């Protein structure tokens, strides 16, 4: 069954959003009478029947709804510096949603090479990944946020940052799936020494993500995978 995203599944009759309707009509060529799945990204999944399909619009009647609790007992928040190439950051967002993440914050640091992001595009990537992986919760994606703003925000009990210098403990040695976690990943070139000192002052723990030097997006996904798997044990 094809899945579509619609933010409000309370009414019995649903008109698909424009982009979703275009996909249903022009790409999938769905017709009246076919059944579809609907996700609101907030834990509700519905089965619906298409009752009207025109050149530009799709109307569906809700047949059933199911509510799903949050997928993890503890939240995973990734704050990740944008990559120089936008497609790499989009790939990270796509895979993080598939693996399982609750919030993504594009992080501005001293060495961040990209000062602008199309958040609407990242949100579309996240929606597509949610549908592909058949998840029912869509992660929050923030606007570009400074390091100072992220670390000053009241947040998770566990606070980590990836660090390549010295011999910090591995993330998997410190992370506990019992409480929320915030993981910071710097840009290529890593955080500056001054930023690392600032993070230590705010009680962030430096962690290693392995012996190899990883790209920003690879490091972020490595951390996401470790934490997600730890919660499934």
Predicted regions and their residues:
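RNA substrate-binding interface of SAM-dependent RNA methyltransferases
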Residues: 65, 69-161
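N-terminal positively charged helical leader segments and presequences
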Residues: 1-68, 120
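Fold-independent oxyanion-binding glycine-rich loops
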Residues: 7-8, 18-19, 41-42, 81-82, ...
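Active-site/ligand-binding-proximal alpha/beta "capping" segment
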Residues: 159-198, 202-209
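Glycine- and other small-residue-rich loops at beta-strand/loop junctions that grip anionic moieties
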Residues: 81, 115, 188, 212, ...
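Generic structural signal for residues in well-ordered beta-strands
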Residues: 60, 138-142, 206
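Structured adenosyl-cofactor binding patch, chiefly the S-adenosyl-L-methionine
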Residues: 193-233
